[in-house]
From Swiss-Prot:
SMART domains given in the database record: 7TM_GPCR_Srsx
Bilayer topology term: Multi-pass membrane protein
PANTHER family reported for this sequence: ADENOSINE RECEPTOR A1 (PTHR24246:SF1), OLFACTORY RECEPTOR AND ADENOSINE RECEPTOR (PTHR24246)
Disulfide bonds: 80-169
Record GO terms (molecular function): G protein-coupled adenosine receptor activity
Family matches, as Pfam families: 7tm_1 (PF00001)
Residue ranges annotated as Cytoplasmic topological domain: 34-46, 103-123, 202-235, 293-326
Extracellular topological intervals: 1-10, 70-80, 147-176, 260-267
Protein name per Swiss-Prot or TrEMBL: Adenosine receptor A1
Sequence similarity: Belongs to the G-protein coupled receptor 1 family.
Regions crossing the membrane: 11-33, 47-69, 81-102, 124-146, 177-201, 236-259, 268-292
GO cellular component entries: dendrite; plasma membrane; synapse
Protein's organism: Pongo abelii (Sumatran orangutan)
Length: 326
């Protein structure tokens, strides 16, 4: 082990690699399933593919760059900044994809009869494009000046050095904590989180309202209806919980860094917070895909067709979708 890498760093790198090895294949499988099953081509699954693409990029690009930044090689300031910005872009795209799916789930419960008329493929494509545009705007903002270059240049000049500063490439050396807290967290993370809380609270209210109506009207098999709606409710609660669990710790630590510079932050807490954010990408295929019957059947077919000698039977594209009853 190189002397510059601590035991905490080595453990962090190992966990990050493990997350990437789970995240990339899992999310590629989601995209693959949509490609091979025509029944998964509606607007709903476009948003799931958006999340899967973002999460593949997190595992394939963000995690390797995060490991590089954690090791801290000697680079020019702007080189380090270019390494840090893709991390911001792709993690932001995951957050916006989560929000898009939350809104989509709300519409499915709120207007089940008009859902397909409102959420058209064209509107879904516009929403997806908007997510990526916003992600690039948020993630590239440090490249346009909101960074730590001035402070680094002053320290560089004080040492009598000339030219562009050469630094040990670390995230906090190039990315301004004011940007991370005031702009990234207070504008682009916390509001989506609060909005999702409100959305899911409304969804729970609508489900409960529908349950009360349906229970009295469906005396034939109320347990079946209860089970279906309970599964939806549990999925929504899990989505919200995992989002908050994954993203809040790191941003809370950033707030501590900005508002209490003298406060000590144990390194292990920072590492745990970072891989929690990346780990959310590995969990998303389970939360968003494995709970949908059409995905489960398609995953099994992909496995049998490509990794076993015996091909799977054709996919029944008429499988009922796991949506609230119209």
């Amino acid at each position: 082990m190189p002397p510059s890498i601590s035991a905490f760093q080595a453990a962090y790198i190992g966990i990050e690699v493990l997350i990437a090895l789970v995240s990339v294949p899992g999310n590629v499988l989601v995209i693959w399933a949509v490609k091979v099953n025509q029944a998964l081509r509606d607007a709903t699954f476009c948003f799931i593919v958006l999340l899967a693409v973002a999460d593949v990029a997190v595992g394939a690009l963000v995690i390797p760059l995060a490991i590089l930044i954690n090791i801290g090689p000697q680079t020019y300031f702007h080189t380090c900044l270019m390494v840090a910005c893709p991390v911001l872009i792709l993690t932001q795209s995951s957050i916006l994809a989560l929000l898009t799916i939350a809104v989509d789930r709300y519409l499915r419960v709120k207007i089940p009869l008009r859902y397909k008329m409102v959420v058209t493929p064209r509107r879904a494509a516009v929403a997806i494009a908007g997510c990526w545009i916003l992600s690039f705007v948020v993630g590239l903002t440090p490249m346009f000046g909101w960074n730590n270059l001035s402070a680094v240049e002053r320290a560089w000049a004080a040492n009598g050095s000339m030219g562009e500063p050469v630094i040990k490439c670390e995230f906090e050396k190039v990315i301004s904590m004011e940007y991370m807290v005031y702009f990234n967290f207070f504008v682009w993370v916390l509001p989506p989180l609060l909005l999702m809380v409100l959305i899911y609270l409304e969804v729970f209210y609508l489900i409960r309202k529908q349950l009360n109506k349906k229970v009295s009207a469906s005396s034939g098999d109320p347990q079946k209806y209860y089970g279906k709606e309970l599964k939806i409710a549990k999925s929504l609660a899990l989505i919200l919980f995992l989002f908050a669990l994954s993203w809040l710790p790191l941003h809370i630590l950033n707030c501590i860094t900005l508002f209490c510079p003298s406060c000590h932050k144990p390194s292990i807490l920072t590492y745990i917070a970072i891989f929690l954010t990346h780990g959310n990408s590995a969990m998303n295929p389970i939360v968003y895909a494995f709970r949908i019957q059409k995905f489960r059947v398609t995953f099994l077919k992909i496995w049998n067709d490509n990794f076993r000698c015996q091909p799977a039977p054709p996919i029944d594209e008429d499988l009922p979708e796991e949506r609230p009853d119209d």
